[in-house]
Amino acid sequence: MNIENTAIRKGRKFDQVLAGARDVFLAEGFSASNMDHVAKAAGVSKATLYSYFPDKESLFIVVVQTECARQSDEAMEHIDQSAAPAVVLGNAARHLLGFMTSEFGQRMFRICVAQADRFPELGLAFYQSGPMVVREKIGAYLRGATQEGQLHITDFDLAADQFGELCKADIFPKILFGVQTVFEPSELDRIIDGAVSTFLAKYGV
């Protein structure tokens, strides 16, 4: 299955199908789910479902792409980027951690890792729609802030990656190994404050 070679037709019930599929993948995971379950959850016929998506893999990829696009837009597009870097980066970190610790974010990450050998396209879709887009958006902000004299950065891609890794400190390893999946606001605040202060200690002016 190659998503790039699969024509996805949109129609009147397209969003309805995606919503049903999202619920099924969250509840059942990838391996246990099937197109019958998706059709039932979406309230559409199997014929309608297959008119949009030829297989479960293509459907999963579009569900991931749609949700990740929404999350990545919220991560930077809804933030006042004219504010001080500490404020902008703090808000960006909060959005990143919000997605990382969400039920959807955790479940999709685990599915993509579990299916990586059989369906590498799933992991690629998750990466390209989520982490890569956020990296590009943060990198664009860092470039603009540097041009405005608010930051001092020469390698914007590296700096964006470093900021992302700082936001994952302590939280991501716990999620990865299933040690902890629910986090208190104070735990997230600690990571956010540490990420921003460490980043600005390196790149602030």
Report the location of each language-model feature:
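C-terminal peripheral helix-coil segments that are non-catalytic and often amphipathic
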Residues: 1-4, 91, 95, 136, ...
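Basic, helix-initiating cap at the start of DNA-binding domains
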Residues: 1-44, 51-58
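Hydrophobic/aromatic residues within well-ordered alpha-helical segments
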Residues: 13, 56, 67-68, 89-92, ...
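Amphipathic alpha-helical linker/stalk segments
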Residues: 63-92, 98-100, 104, 108, ...
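Helical hydrophobic small-molecule/effector-binding pocket
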Residues: 86-118, 122, 167-171, 201
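Amphipathic alpha-helical packing segments from all-alpha helical-bundle domains
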Residues: 87, 98, 107, 111-113, ...
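Membrane-interface starts of transmembrane alpha-helices
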Residues: 152, 156-160
